[in-house]
């Protein structure tokens, strides 16, 4: 069984933990402090960091988290890699497997050129592509790219 834990960050962001027993993944850790606090409070081991895109409010905590959990794996978009970190850079159609959980990688350009989303097990982690109130802003992509990306997300089961 997997549990998604919401970790508030900054004034309007969320960081996501995916928990399985005493292990977890973290998605888009823009700030390490609230993640480290939650991991300590729940006695969780961080196995991997999943990034959707390169903006600081999504990657700002990576360095500190990797210092605390040096064996954690780093995953992120192939077309938006973090040059200062060794990671596995993912593209559309790739898949991450962790403790029986399979997450498919979907390239969803629009907010950024290399933006990716992770989908599987009735979960979607789509970074700044889609919010409950609408879509994300365009920083690098075009309206046509964002439209196509939103159509891909809308077609998911």
Question: Predicted segments — roles?
Answer:
Residues 1-44, 117-133:
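Conserved beta-strand hairpin/beta-sheet module of binuclear metal-dependent hydrolase folds
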Residues 4, 76, 80-82, 104, ...:
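Residue-level detector of functional hotspots within protein domains
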Residues 10-11, 24, 29-104:
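Active-site HxH/HxHxD metal-binding segment of metal-dependent hydrolases
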Residues 48-55, 109-119:
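Short N-terminal signal/transit or membrane-insertion segments
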Residues 55, 88, 95, 105, ...:
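Short, flexible coil/turn micro-motifs enriched in small/turn-prone residues
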Residues 102, 113-157:
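Metallo-beta-lactamase
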């Amino acid at each position: 069984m997997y549990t998604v834990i919401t970790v508030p960050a900054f004034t309007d962001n969320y960081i996501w933990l995916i928990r399985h027993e005493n292990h977890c993944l973290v998605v888009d850790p823009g700030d390490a402090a609230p993640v480290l606090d939650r991991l300590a409070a729940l006695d969780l081991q961080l196995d991997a960091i999943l990034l959707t895109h390169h903006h600081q409010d999504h990657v700002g905590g990576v360095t500190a988290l990797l210092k605390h959990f040096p064996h954690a794996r780093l995953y992120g978009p192939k077309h938006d890699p973090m040059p200062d970190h060794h990671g596995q850079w993912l593209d559309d159609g790739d898949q991450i497997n962790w403790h029986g959980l399979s997450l498919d990688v979907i390239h969803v350009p629009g907010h950024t050129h290399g933006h990716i989303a992770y989908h599987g097990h009735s979960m979607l982690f789509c970074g700044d592509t889609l919010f409950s109130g609408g879509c994300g802003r365009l920083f690098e992509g075009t309206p046509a790219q964002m439209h196509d990306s939103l159509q891909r997300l809308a077609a998911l089961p």
